[in-house]
């Protein structure tokens, strides 16, 4: 059987941390920013962790 291919889109969006958790960037931070408050925009540029219920699925996609 051939090797499994990783999901290239997922590989660009997710990174696995040293402890094995999956890190992601927040959405809604790239355009249409005028109406969003400074505080909201600042918080959108902080990375966050993938929810525990989705972690197994994401790891399978990126073959980590």
Curated annotation (Swiss-Prot):
One of the GO BP terms on file: translation
Chain ranges passing through the membrane: none
Single GO cellular component term: cytosolic large ribosomal subunit
InterPro entries: Ribosomal_bL35, Ribosomal_bL35-like, Ribosomal_bL35_CS, Ribosomal_bL35_sf
Molecular-function GO term, any one: structural constituent of ribosome
Superkingdom of this protein's organism: Bacteria
Pfam families: Ribosomal_L35p
The keyword Ribosomal protein is assigned to this record: yes
UniProtKB keywords: Ribonucleoprotein, Ribosomal protein
HAMAP family from the UniProt entry: Ribosomal_bL35
Family (UniProt): Belongs to the bacterial ribosomal protein bL35 family.
Name used for this protein in its record: Large ribosomal subunit protein bL35
């Amino acid at each position: 059987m051939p090797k499994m291919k990783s999901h290239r889109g997922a590989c660009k969006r997710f990174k696995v941390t040293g402890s094995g958790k999956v890190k992601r960037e927040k959405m809604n931070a790239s355009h249409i920013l005028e109406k969003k408050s400074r505080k909201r925009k600042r918080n959108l540029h902080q990375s966050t962790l993938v929810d525990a219920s989705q972690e197994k699925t994401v790891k399978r996609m990126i073959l980590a």
